[in-house]
UniProtKB/Swiss-Prot annotation:
Homodimer. Heterotetramer of two MnmE and two MnmG subunits. InterPro entries: FAD/NAD-bd_sf, GIDA_C_N, MnmG, MnmG-rel, MnmG-rel_CS, MnmG_C, MnmG_C_subdom, MnmG_C_subdom_sf. Its cofactor is FAD. FAD binds at residues 13-18. It comes from Dechloromonas aromatica (strain RCB). GO terms for cellular component: cytosol. This is tRNA uridine 5-carboxymethylaminomethyl modification enzyme MnmG.
Amino acid sequence: MLYPTRFDVIVVGGGHAGTEAALAAARAGANTLLLTHNLDTLGAMSCNPSIGGIGKGHLVREVDALGGAMAAATDEAGIQFRILNASKGPAVRATRAQADRVLYKQAIRTRLENQPNLTIFAEACDDLIVEGDKVCGAVTQLGIRFMAEAVVLTAGTFLNGKIHVGLENYTGGRMGDPPSVSLASRLKELKLPQGRLKTGTPPRLDGKTIDFSVMEEQHSDDPLPVFSFLGNAAQHPKQLPCWITETNERTHDIIRSGLDRSPMYTGVIEGVGPRYCPSIEDKIHRFADKNQHNVFLEPEGLTTHEIYPNGVSTSLPFDIQLALVRSIRGMENCHILRPGYAIEYDFYDPRGLKDTLETKAIHGLFFAGQINGTTGYEEAAAQGLLAGINAVRYVRGQSGWCPKRNEAYLGVLVDDLITRGVSDPYRMFTSRAEYRLSLREDNADLRLTEQGRELGLVDDVRWTAFCQKRDAIAAEQERLKSTWVNPKITPADDCIRVLGKAIDHEYNLFELLRRPEVTYTSLLTLPGAGEAQTDPLVVEQLEISAKYQGYIDRQAEEVAKSSSYENTVLPSELDYSSVAGLSNEVRQKLAQHKPQTIGQASRIQGITPAAISLLLIHLKRHNLSQAA
């Protein structure tokens, strides 16, 4: 059957990538269809009940700055909020929240159901309609044909998913959900470059059978952080603690005794797992010198006793899982509600994507999330938003949009994926961003909201709040720079009280704020300093911009130097065999990767500075240079 309505954009999958993609496309005004196999799992947190963390929290704030849903949903569902790296510099501080799974899904579904231009249909997608090298629609299990100009595929771990518990395995997209086999077969026919990856999850525990009194208790920060730039702590539900315990030598002996039945260590699992989120059996093997590993017991929600034991992801046989759990302090009588498991799934080499996340091989087909080799809700959400807005721009015949590496962690994420590919599931860290001093959580809105408004992603409420904040920062910064403190007028006692010492010549307030020991609040107590700003977000930006100005200015100079590379386009039809002086290895890599700019080419492994110089000479000699 051909569905009577033709859509602009179809989004396949209702996870974190799919929901952000559908919301972004619809916000931008496109008639959008979201296909999901189950309405009840829209926005489901398939693994850990948390959002954010180092690098990941930065992505969440960027999604929020562009009008996305993840941060706001977390504010409504978060049952514990903490700032990680709070004692370190602002570039690496990150928000992390435990979320009530049910409340989070409700928050996402409410936004989906109330989003204009968005239609939801509950049917698994079994096929894509492709004519020549262009996608034209999608076909469901029942054979219903939905037509569209663009399709965003966010299949998560469902493509040929296989679940492993010990040496037992069965097909599944996640525990309790069927895999997507027909769609996986169809994608193989399209000759897209693919591979297999693996991820895992720990057993879920019954909190009624755990002795929390012998564990370290961990509470929310005070005052409570918020994730969304429009959020406030009053939105948060009741806050719950987490608990910390640890494995021991007995635990490790139990794990070692089960390795002969581990799918990872017997070669049953072929997919590569996440390097930075290893299973407990992998930790014991890789870090044999450690006699204990922390286990964080995280509540799954306000209305359940279910506990997520962060740190013991495993695919060991169930009898070993039960024994290892019961060997841990406070968990001697613990009941497992659900076993831990590993899941293998198909992914597609992201080097086959443009920076818009459109596939190079099939026009109008976009990939986002774990299908691109990433791991994590936050990475998926960021890709989903980007793919959603670019699908709309593709339909409208507009140029694609992707922030650069110096503009957003989203830009770092995409650039890493499409230039370097993945050998194991990709996770975001602040260390991946060379311009991280400028890419902070606190200024994500100042970096991206104006672009989001131009793209049609930012509504009037967010735009008004942003403009008020932006203008207040600019006005107060200008006032500080034009308000002077003169030692002949300001009493020395006041200078010593605020600055720690007297001053010997005139300074403006902004110059004084650059001093590490001086706070904005104390500075404004100087006679004649004027009325202080009361908005803490404005004050935060004033202090950071003053104290880190020198570093930020130097980073801006580095960006300016590299911008010529980033803005020089490599024609898609360029024949690298015609570029004089390139080695055969370099030619093969460039032909395989098809970088869009000189900047992307420079980050491909094995591409030397000399090769980049030869490319630039070739472009200039043949009048092929053009700006991005």
